[in-house]
């Protein structure tokens, strides 16, 4: 029994890998091509040794067959197909058809590159510099095809705006502040006045009127005022700046003061005071345009000039009817004549009072300092005047 038992017992226990030990597995994984023949030889040897013991092994523990997929990792992944879209894609995808996506590649400048904020670098679809700029193909319109209807409408609107821009040129040339004042005063719509499309349309709370209409109305008003002032000045060529200022008060239009040959405006106080720079240094950087007198020869009398201008102003007020001096004095009311005469009397009294106190001997009697100058026991012979 001992001999039969020893003969029926297998010589070794088969590993679950079909006769493969750990050392052979590592060597085969390291060099699969070189060890192909050795693997086949070891497999055949293990099969020959396991033949007497196949009856004692279960059916599931049969030797594992050699598969090429074991030594080719790339082939172990299932290939994607149309029937199995969930499969993992291959490492090298097929080239994508460019079509119309890349015909405009680097045909325009990159706006972010100009601002210095482009993060795409060389992968950017726009040109980074003039040397990187390309030209689109000549038949790009045929490749792209006709644009949608919405884009055609936008282009038509842009063309209409381009056509309307020359008509808006006078608006730009005029004073911007005047236009803003007209818009605020008349409550006009800003977008409509400057040629833009108002998003509110007929529901807008502001008036949709052309700005040039209100500008023309204000221009006509100014022109009529200037014409009336010019006619008045032409009727009286001998009037001075004060007369023009009086007319300006009636017409509420700014009228420039009279000018000399050099184009310098002569004010009311023209050459009425000496130039300090000319008196100290003998030179003035303004020259003949200086408003101050360079020497006594150029000095004017300011009082006489003001009185003359006042007379001209009175003449401009009474320009419709010229009345002689005697008749004008006779036509004055009694109260006005009395007031004029009383005013003259007051001025005469003031002048007499100044002349009366002009003597130094009389003035020094006002204060009490002269008492200290008298000798002790001496009294003043002249009474103090009040």
UniProtKB/Swiss-Prot annotation:
GO terms for biological process: regulation of DNA-templated transcription. Residues 43-58 have a biased composition (Low complexity). The keyword Zinc applies. Residues 20-37, 72-85 have a biased composition (Polar residues). The keyword Metal-binding applies. GO terms for molecular function: DNA binding; DNA-binding transcription factor activity; mRNA binding; zinc ion binding. Residues 1-90, 136-166 are annotated as: Disordered. Residues 151-166 have a biased composition (Basic and acidic residues). It comes from Arabidopsis thaliana. It comes from the Eukaryota. PROSITE patterns: ZF_C3H1. Gene3D superfamilies: Zinc finger, CCCH-type. InterPro entries: ZFP36-like, Znf_CCCH, Znf_CCCH_sf. Keywords: DNA-binding, Metal-binding, Repeat, Zinc, Zinc-finger. This is Zinc finger CCCH domain-containing protein 39. Signal peptide: none annotated. A zinc finger (C3H1-type) spans 104-131, 183-211, 269-297. SMART domains: ZnF_C3H1 (SM00356).
């Amino acid at each position: 029994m001992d001999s039969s038992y020893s003969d029926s017992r297998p010589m070794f226990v088969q590993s679950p890998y079909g006769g493969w030990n750990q050392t052979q597995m590592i060597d085969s994984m390291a060099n699969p091509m070189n060890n192909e023949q050795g693997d086949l030889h070891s497999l055949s040897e293990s099969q020959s040794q396991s033949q007497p013991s196949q009856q004692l092994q279960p059916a599931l523990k049969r030797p594992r067959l050699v598969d090429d997929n074991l030594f080719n990792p790339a082939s172990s992944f299932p290939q994607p197909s149309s029937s199995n879209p969930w499969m993992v894609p291959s490492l090298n995808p097929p080239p994508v058809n460019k079509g119309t996506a890349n015909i405009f590649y680097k045909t325009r400048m990159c706006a972010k590159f100009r601002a210095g904020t482009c993060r795409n670098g060389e992968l950017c679809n726009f040109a980074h510099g003039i040397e990187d700029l390309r030209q689109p193909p000549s038949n790009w319109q045929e490749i792209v095809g006709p644009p949608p209807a919405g884009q055609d409408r936008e282009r038509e609107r842009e063309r209409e705006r381009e056509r309307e821009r020359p008509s808006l040129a006078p608006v730009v040339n005029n004073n911007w502040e005047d236009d803003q004042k007209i818009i605020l005063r008349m409550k006009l719509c800003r977008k409509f006045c400057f040629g833009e499309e108002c998003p509110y349309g007929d529901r807008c709370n502001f008036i949709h009127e052309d700005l040039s209409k209100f500008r023309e109305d204000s221009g006509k008003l100014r022109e009529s005022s200037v014409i009336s002032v010019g006619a008045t000045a032409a009727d009286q060529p001998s009037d001075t700046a004060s007369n023009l200022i009086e007319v300006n008060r009636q017409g509420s239009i700014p009228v420039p003061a009279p000018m000399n040959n050099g184009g310098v405006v002569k004010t009311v106080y023209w050459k009425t005071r000496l130039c300090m720079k000319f008196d100290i240094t003998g030179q003035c950087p303004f020259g003949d345009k200086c408003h101050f007198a360079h020497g006594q020869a150029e000095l004017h009398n300011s009082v006489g000039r003001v009185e003359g201008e006042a007379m001209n102003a009175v003449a401009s007020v009474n320009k419709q009817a010229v009345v002689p001096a005697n008749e004008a004095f006779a036509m004055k009311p009694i109260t006005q004549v009395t007031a004029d005469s009383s005013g003259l009397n007051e001025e005469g009294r003031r002048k007499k009072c100044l002349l009366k106190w002009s003597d130094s001997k009389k003035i020094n009697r006002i204060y009490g300092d002269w008492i200290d100058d008298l000798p002790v026991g001496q009294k003043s012979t002249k009474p103090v005047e009040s």
